[in-house]
C-alpha cells in the first residue's frame, strides 16, 4: 500500500522531449528536472511519476491507480491528447480520484486547435500557462481538495 498522500503525476505524448522541443514555448527544463523539483518541494508527499507516448498506457495507469488504491490525486499533462482524446476523457470520468489538468503553456493563447480541451469538463480543475510551476500549482490544488478527506 502507498503512503496516505501519494500523487500520480501523469504525462502524455511529447513530454519526454521537454527541454529540446520548442523551448521558447515549453521552457528548457526536462521532465526529469520538473519531477525532481516537484519531489523536493513536497517532501511530505510520495509521488508516482509516469510518462508515455501511448494513449492506452495513460488509460491503464489511470485505471490501475484507482484499482490499486493509495492515490490521493492525479496531476495530468495529457499533451496533445488534451485536444481530442474522448477515451481519456471517459477514463477520467470513470475514476473517483480527483484529476487536475496542467499545461506548461497557456493553451488558450495558442493556436486555435490547442484552445479546446476535451478533458477539462471532467477534471477537478485546470492550470495552464505557468511553465513548470503549473505542476506545483496542480499539487497544491490537490492538497487543498484532499487534506480534509479521510484516508
Curated annotation (Swiss-Prot):
- Gene3D superfamilies, alphabetized: Dehydroquinase, class II
Top-rank taxon = Bacteria
Q: Where does this protein act, in terms of pathway?
A: Metabolic intermediate biosynthesis; chorismate biosynthesis; chorismate from D-erythrose 4-phosphate and phosphoenolpyruvate: step 3/7
Q: What is this enzyme's EC?
A: 4.2.1.10
Q: Where is this site: Transition state stabilizer?
A: 21
Keywords annotated in UniProt: Amino-acid biosynthesis, Aromatic amino acid biosynthesis, Lyase
- Positions annotated as active site in the UniProt record: 26, 103
Record PANTHER family = CATABOLIC 3-DEHYDROQUINASE
Family under the similarity heading: Belongs to the type-II 3-dehydroquinase family.
**Task performed by this protein:** Catalyzes a trans-dehydration via an enolate intermediate.
Indicate the quaternary assembly.
Homododecamer.
Q: Give the protein name, as stated in the record.
A: 3-dehydroquinate dehydratase
Q: Name the species this protein comes from.
A: Pelodictyon phaeoclathratiforme (strain DSM 5477 / BU-1)
Amino acid at each position: 500500500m502507498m503512503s496516505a498522500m501519494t500523487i500520480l503525476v501523469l504525462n502524455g505524448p511529447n513530454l519526454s522531449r521537454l527541454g529540446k522541443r520548442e523551448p521558447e514555448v515549453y521552457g528548457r527544463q526536462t521532465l526529469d528536472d520538473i519531477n525532481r523539483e516537484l519531489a523536493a518541494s513536497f517532501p511530505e508527499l510520495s509521488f508516482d511519476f509516469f510518462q508515455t507516448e501511448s494513449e492506452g498506457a495513460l488509460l491503464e495507469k489511470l485505471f490501475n491507480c484507482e484499482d490499486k488504491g493509495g492515490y490521493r490525486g492525479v496531476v495530468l499533462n495529457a499533451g496533445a491528447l488534451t485536444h481530442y482524446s474522448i477515451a481519456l476523457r471517459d477514463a477520467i470520468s470513470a475514476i473517483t480520484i480527483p484529476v487536475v489538468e496542467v499545461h506548461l503553456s497557456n493553451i488558450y493563447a495558442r493556436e486555435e486547435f490547442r484552445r479546446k480541451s476535451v478533458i477539462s469538463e471532467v477534471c477537478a480543475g485546470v492550470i495552464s500557462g505557468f511553465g513548470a510551476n503549473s505542476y506545483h500549482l496542480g499539487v497544491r490544488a490537490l492538497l487543498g481538495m484532499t487534506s480534509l478527506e479521510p484516508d
